Amino acid sequence: ALAVQPGLAAPVPVPDPRPLLTMEDMAHGDHGSHGAGKGMEGGCGAMMAEGGCGAAMHGAHAGHGAAKPVVHPASEAGNPLVDMQSSPTGPRLDDPGVGLRGNGRRVLTYADLRSLFDDPDGRDPGREVELHLTGHMEKFAWSFNGIPFASAEPLRLNYGERLRVVLVNDTMMHHPIHLHGLWSDLEDADGAFQVRKHTIDMPPGTRRSYRVRADALGRWAYHCHLLYHMEGGMMREVRVEERA
């Protein structure tokens, strides 16, 4: 036992009941939307395939984290590397996770994290990029927007810009998403700055957003930190470039 001095021992606590992983835990209680090629590409078209509509943003982004219908990128439609899509999603920042709910103990979650400093940048994001975490479990294929790394164009950021990244997890697995070189400023359910991170955990079926300041020129890796998912294609190159 871990103790303050040799010879001390504490009683072994009774283990929690073995949790059951259900379809609901994987955000597919209705079995998800199988068959991504059923006309679900939505209105952003090819622009969504390369990282979102990129529309200009104005003012506060209140209510951004609330559950809402999902618009899937066109690159997911009819894609043999995408075996399911999420239904309405939300951030679920206060969810402890499988086996940790309702056990009589307090479990820390993202909702408990609060930065000791204000938003380090202070600007509203000038544009928004939405990326879907996608895959095909039987083929062990992983990707962003249904496009594996080998086939994907870089995500291009203008040096000095502030943007919002929205991630939607269409899969039944967790994906901790890490952007090299730049900070990820997680937003709360109302779209306000909450805490600075360098990896954003994405449970199944969640939609979470964070702000990025493109303040480091260069070519940066952007990937799932489950490295076998990265090797399977869930990776992009991010290029921070001087404005033309």
State where each predicted segment sits.
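Extended terminal and domain-junction accessory segments
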Residues: 1-162, 215-219, 227-244
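Asparagine-centered strand-capping/turn motif at beta-strand->loop junctions
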Residues: 167-171
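Short beta-strand/loop motifs in extracellular/secreted proteins, especially
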Residues: 173-177
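Beta-strand secondary-structure signal
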Residues: 130, 164-166, 209-211
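Acidic helix/loop microenvironments that form the catalytic cleft of cell-wall polysaccharide enzymes
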Residues: 180, 226
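Extracytoplasmic beta-sandwich strand-turn segments characteristic of Greek-key/jelly-roll folds
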Residues: 151-156, 181-217, 244
